[in-house]
Amino acid sequence: IKAKFGTAIAPIVATKADANKAVTVIVDLLHNKAYDAKGECAIPGDMADEVEALRAELMEAAAGADEELMEKFFESMELSAADMAKGLKIGVRDGSVCPVLCGSAVTGMGVDMLMKTIVELVPVATDMPAEKAQDESGNEVEVAFDPNGPTAAIVFKTISDQYGKFSMIKVVRGKVTGDMSLYNPATGNTEKLGRLYSMKGKKGEEIKEICCGDIGAIGKMDRVKTGNTMCDAKNVVILEGIEYPAP
């Protein structure tokens, strides 16, 4: 994987497989714990050297993301789980670390670990750098993730099915509620919103609001296209649209 995707790859787990190549044990390298199909178990003795080596690599990846952690690591050549998580979270935010996990949707092994890792290592919106944008005059500006700011959202995908058209949005600033009217700088139209949805697979669950950093869907926005910005009419910004690869 590293040969293909580069040194940012950071395995968070080590695995043990049986004769049929089915994974039987997953070791959480961050917390130094092992799990099998029944739950937490002892780390297998024949995995000790591999786990030690991979944990050392993970510590280096975490330390490399933060100068303070790097100094701490060089002093003792060891980092606590909390320090490792801190460094990895910084690395994930900056793109210098790409965690790799293992799991099976069929057996359920590793799924809990994946969910916990997302909570522990993936930064929330307010930790992320500001989004690039333009104002009405075409000047470059930045839009910080601010839950209390004037609303700004980007339409990143459009879905059409037997139930109609859904505009998928990511809220960069403020929040979106169904009783709002938002301005579309691309068309000059003010759009009255209606029902909002949280998409779960192909099904939409109706919700009251989409908060800063969240994604959701707006139904029946016929004049809105993928890449459009939806924003407060008194605070117009144009967020960077989707860059499509050349055919």
Indicate where each model-derived feature is located.
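Structural and coupling elements of P-loop NTPases
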Residues: 1-247
